[in-house]
Amino acid sequence: MKKVKLSLIANERSRKTSFIKRKDGIFKKLHELSTLCGVQACALIYSPFIPVPESWPSREGAKKVASRFLEMPPTARTKKMMDQETYLMERITKAKEQLKNLAAENRELQVRRFMFDCVEGKMSQYHYDAKDLQDLQSCINLYLDQLNGRIESIKENGESLLSSVSPFPTRIGVDEIGDESFSDSPIHATTGVVDTLNATNPHVLTGDMTPFLDADATAVTASSRFFDHIPYENMNMSQNLHEPFQHLVPTNVCDFFQNQNMNQVQYQAPNNLFNQIQREFYNINLNLNLNLNSNQYLNQQQSFMNPMVEQHMNHVGGRESIPFVDGNCYNYHQLPSNQLPAVDHASTSYMPSTTGVYDPYINNNL
């Protein structure tokens, strides 16, 4: 909802419209208040737009409520009474209190930043006076009091300070570890330190592991002791991809997890995969007329088609198959081409020939 600016409406017509609208709203709210809560209320409104002041609920009802109000003692009457000046003074007092609280919060943040910068050696960047130093001292004393109170509470509860706080990491040199895994590794540590293992959980380090390591040329090619045996151990990397798959017996934990969900089914790959694909694809045109008539396609040469047919068709003794695009999803096989009777390709052509019945007509009109 748009916030209304509380100022006098300059336009007289708009001011009158707003007056009528809001007056009816006040009377409606008073009716709801007196009906729902069972209280006595009245309203008197004077306006330059109406000659006679308006009262609610009526003139008699307004007089009755006003007389009861005047019978009350002056202290009780002025306790909740407020005019415009009193209302504005109360708002100003609340605003000043909020401003004071915000100023104190900003000062606390400034002094805290000043303290941290002094710890970092940036005290020379500030222009401070005696009051700033006093505020800094108060801030430091506040933090010290909190730390001392925490220490005293721990001592009173019978707890040890070292047991409640995680121990500091103890750093030792790499040469003092004495593990065979580091001595056999192709990566040799020269200088640096590593963190010790946690006493409660030996698999977790208590701090950062920041060794300075240098590696020679053998560190790149030589296999380490833990990771390099997983993808390549006991696997024939030079096996023929067209041969049947050979499943290896797992020799370690990693090979077992790789092969435990595999079915031991061998698949015989075709000897010539591309030849089979070509035969399946180019058998679509077996029933077409390859010996096209020169009168149909004058630019078509028989010598150009023969090499393509010989290249993409299988040998004579091979098995011909009906392609999948003809609706043969089961790949039924035909008889070998050497057992099929010799059929003239011209008889299987779906194109009408220009020679034959229409020869006299063509010869007479050309």
Curated annotation (Swiss-Prot):
The keyword Nucleus applies. GO terms for cellular component: nucleus. Its main location: nucleus. InterPro entries: SRF-like_MADS-box, TF_MADSbox, TF_MADSbox_sf. Pfam families: SRF-TF. Residues 86-115 form a coiled coil. It is found in: Nucleus. Residues 1-59 form the MADS-box domain. It comes from the Eukaryota. GO terms for biological process: positive regulation of transcription by RNA polymerase II. Interacts with AGL62. Probable transcription factor. This is Agamous-like MADS-box protein AGL36. It comes from Arabidopsis thaliana (Mouse-ear cress). The lineage of its organism: Eukaryota, Viridiplantae, Streptophyta, Embryophyta, Tracheophyta. The gene is AGL36.
